[in-house]
UniProtKB/Swiss-Prot annotation:
The cytochrome bc1 complex contains 11 subunits: 3 respiratory subunits (MT-CYB, CYC1 and UQCRFS1), 2 core proteins (UQCRC1 and UQCRC2) and 6 low-molecular weight proteins (UQCRH/QCR6, UQCRB/QCR7, UQCRQ/QCR8, UQCR10/QCR9, UQCR11/QCR10 and a cleavage product of UQCRFS1). This cytochrome bc1 complex then forms a dimer. This is Cytochrome b. A ubiquinone binds at H201. The gene is MT-CYB. Gene3D superfamilies: Cytochrome Bc1 Complex, Chain C (1.20.810.10). The chain crosses the membrane at residues 33-53, 77-98, 113-133, 178-198, 226-246, 288-308, 320-340, 347-367. It comes from Arctogalidia trivirgata.
Length: 379
């Protein structure tokens, strides 16, 4: 009798990826976030699909269609809030996943890391376009402000912005194309995630010690399957707590006002998960400089492997680097807070200092601390 999991072309791929996959025996709960991101993506695609059945991407009816989903569609309110808060859970898992990769030196898997950065950019683009769709005040003004940043590009900037808008302002054409892209991008993300896993399985998983674990591997199923299911249950519990008890906690009240091009909200700000980058953008007085800093705040992840000066892979046994890592986390929290504050003293100064610290830690302090640690170990 043939062994189907090991002989059937399709089942074999699933078997080698999720069942018989050799995994290090010591990976901690920080390795759960990959599977949680997969669950978040599936959840977002499913809830998004049901929302798309009732949503209309027209400036005159978009806001009303979202209201209709919440009021008239069976369980429409829960689908809508699962989708909106699911995005927040997605980004929480993303930040944890990237942070884990930085802490334990997983960025030495260059292909996996670079596809991960591409995934991060794609998810951010998708989330931004999704935020525009309800066509509330913050949707409209957020879209206007963020797309307008492209006008800082010399020579072609203005033409590029008008090309993206499909006219001379954010209007029906913009909303329609944003809906089209918001619908298609999650499937592109799914394809990229498969490639991400493909490259990861070429090298095998990293582990907290950063040492090779070839001599100590265990099968993914049942050990990590059960561990992942526990993580998934906790994720769903947290999401349901958010959706059922405080669905608007992470949203903006301005988005419950229909979009009005004649009335600007007092503080234009994106969703909470973009606030750190928004704070870096605002901390530079020059428009082009701000846009470059905004892009670099994420793109800097691609430079991290080049700045790895330590002779150890993981930060597990590197106390100086650990202190700097947690300082970076605190700095990102400060930037997130500043991004939601008005542009006035003392927030401007705090934002500028936090932005300088962010780039200093990653570009200067981390490599120097690694060299010092090497010296202490007499390597």
């Amino acid at each position: 009798m043939t062994n189907i999991p090991k002989s059937h072309p399709l089942v074999k791929i699933v078997n080698e990826s999720f069942i018989d996959l050799p995994a290090p025996s010591n990976i901690s709960a920080w390795w759960n976030f990959g599977s949680l991101l997969g669950i978040c993506l599936i959840l977002q695609i499913l809830t998004g699909l049901f929302l798309a059945m009732h949503y209309t991407s027209d400036t005159t009816t978009a806001f009303s269609s979202v209201t209709h989903i919440c009021r008239d569609v069976n369980y429409g309110w829960i689908i809508r809030y699962m989708h909106a808060n699911g995005a927040s859970m997605f980004f929480i898992c993303l930040f944890m996943h990237v942070g884990r990769g930085m802490y334990y030196g997983s960025y030495t898997f260059l292909e996996t890391w670079n596809i991960g950065i591409l995934l991060l950019f794609t998810v951010m683009a998708t989330a931004f376009m999704g935020y525009v769709l309800p066509w509330g005040q913050m949707s409209f003004w957020g879209a206007t402000v963020i797309t307008n940043l492209l006008s800082a590009i010399p020579y072609i900037g203005t033409d590029l912005v008008e090309w993206i808008w499909g006219g001379f302002s954010v209007d029906k054409a913009t909303l329609t194309r944003f809906f089209a892209f918001h619908f298609i991008l999650p499937f592109i993300i799914s394809a990229l995630a498969v490639v991400h896993l493909l490259f990861l399985h070429e090298t095998g998983s990293n582990n907290p010690s950063g040492l090779t674990s070839d001599s100590d591997k265990i099968p993914f199923h049942p050990y990590y399957m059960i561990k992942d299911i526990l993580g998934i249950l906790l994720l769903i519990l947290m999401l349901l707590l958010l959706v059922l008890f405080s669905p608007d906690l992470l949203g903006d009240p301005d988005n419950y006002t229909p979009a009005n091009p004649l009335n600007t909200p007092p503080h234009i700000k994106p969703e909470w998960y973009f606030l750190f980058a928004y704070a870096i953008l605002r901390s530079i007085p020059n428009k082009l400089g701000g846009v470059l800093a905004l892009i670099l705040s994420i793109l800097i992840l691609a430079i991290i492997p080049l700045l790895h000066t330590s002779k150890q892979r993981s930060m597990m046994f590197r106390p100086f680097s650990q202190c700097l890592f947690w300082l970076l986390v605190a700095d990102l929290l400060i930037l997130t807070w500043i991004g939601g504050q008005p542009v006035e003293y003392p927030f401007i100064t705090i934002g500028q200092l936090a932005s300088i610290l962010y780039f200093s830690i990653l570009l200067i302090l981390m490599p120097i601390s690694s060299i010092i640690e090497n010296h202490f170990l007499k390597w």
